[in-house]
Amino acid sequence: EPSQALTKFGYSNIEEAKKDLAVRAHTSTQLSFRPNVVFTVMESMSGDIFNSHDSLANNTLGSLETAMEDAVVFRKGVSIENGTFPSLEGLLFDTPISPISQSIYGRKELSFSQVRAFKEACYRTIFLTGCPEPWRQINDTFKFYGFEEIYGQAAIGEKFPNAEKSPWGIGDKWMFKFAEDLLKEAEGTGRPVFIMMLSTTNHPPFKVPDGEQVSKVDISKLPKTINLEGSYDGNM
């Protein structure tokens, strides 16, 4: 009922709501300070990681738990597709159509790529992933979408030769170390950097790399929405 919604948000009539909705913020696109921007996509990350978290019984968030206290968290996000690459392209191109980069348009400059805004603002644009660079031909096609540099398993492994490799790539911690070095370079040059990262460690099969120790899972402490088979019982 519209009138109930108006009352709930403190309006006495529809005209009051329209006035607030019509307010425009006047901002400049020319920032005096251009910050470095890092956009990290975690493979297979879902709400169950947050819903299963228990600081004592099942610490699924690790150090992210304290970071979330000051973070803006959206818990209702939905993946654009049930697949890594379609979801990645959805973020890059804002479209459910996939795979664009492996179609006849794969080696064409796409004006609707979200990365172009950073490149036009003179950012150094980098795609960084723990998976092999030839995966889905990203080392070739992503340069057409605004990424100046693409780094993956080979580049990270060359820099950190002791890093353990998995069926899907190299451990996430090495990818983040690589990103830290890129950010330090940006500080030294004064040119801001945009880094889009795609992790691999959370991709099945779930094997923690580099001998890292993780806490055991107390199944009895998992939320009722997750049963022993790892599926949902419908009572979300």
Regions found by a protein language model. Name each.
Residues 1-236:
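Soluble catalytic regions of membrane-associated enzymes that act on cell-envelope
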